[in-house]
Amino acid sequence: MTNNEKVINNKKSTDSSKLFRYQAKFVAGAMNINQIPNFLLPEIAFIGKSNVGKSSLINTICNNKNLAKVSNIPGRTGQINFFNLADKLIIVDLPGYGFANVPISVKEQWEVLISYYLRNSNNLRLVNLLIDSRRGIKENDKKVAELLLKNKRSFQIIFTKFDKVTDCKNLTDEAQNFLTTLHYSCNVMYVSSRSKEGARELKASLAKCIIKPQRSKGR
């Protein structure tokens, strides 16, 4: 039994295999708040530090390596990107945070954009907070988690690049201690875009979002 299977109690979802069998497509990019669309469909968002592997993970779960642009240069995703999956789900790729070599004015613009989206989206069901398995949870990640709770957004923690670490026990302990300080409970998952480990479990958790709304369990 893998760590992810323990997290979701071994529940398999045929809905996820059916949903992610469809081809996702890019439908909009928003560089400012006036460009944020309303598709009237459930949305699930991905957020994390620059170069955490957001685009690669989105490509992995959508089975399309060219869907979200992948770059080794941190800070390349400078807008909110929206992808439509079978007219059933909108996948939202939020700009990365924590990259130092970006002008302060640009950082502030991204912060305004992200904060506005998290505060105002009526369709957002779940946020996936991505953490690099090699780095662990950093101060910027904690601030984002607090922002999510402040806006009453449900989230789950996704440790990316899991193929590059040998043991998840320290990560699990770190995540649980972190969640305890937040007085929040959520899934903690481990995924590798390279080996595909954890991808099926992640898809299952996302597919649930089109069935029923996700409510914050904190505070």
From Swiss-Prot:
GO molecular function: GTP binding; metal ion binding
Segments traversing the membrane: none
Family matches, as SUPFAM superfamilies: P-loop containing nucleoside triphosphate hydrolases (SSF52540)
Disulfide bonds: none
PROSITE patterns, per database record: G_ENGB
Record: residues binding GTP: 48-55, 75-79, 93-96, 160-163, 191-193
Protein family (similarity comment): Belongs to the TRAFAC class TrmE-Era-EngA-EngB-Septin-like GTPase superfamily. EngB GTPase family.
UniProt name for this protein: Probable GTP-binding protein EngB
Originating organism: Rickettsia canadensis (strain McKiel)
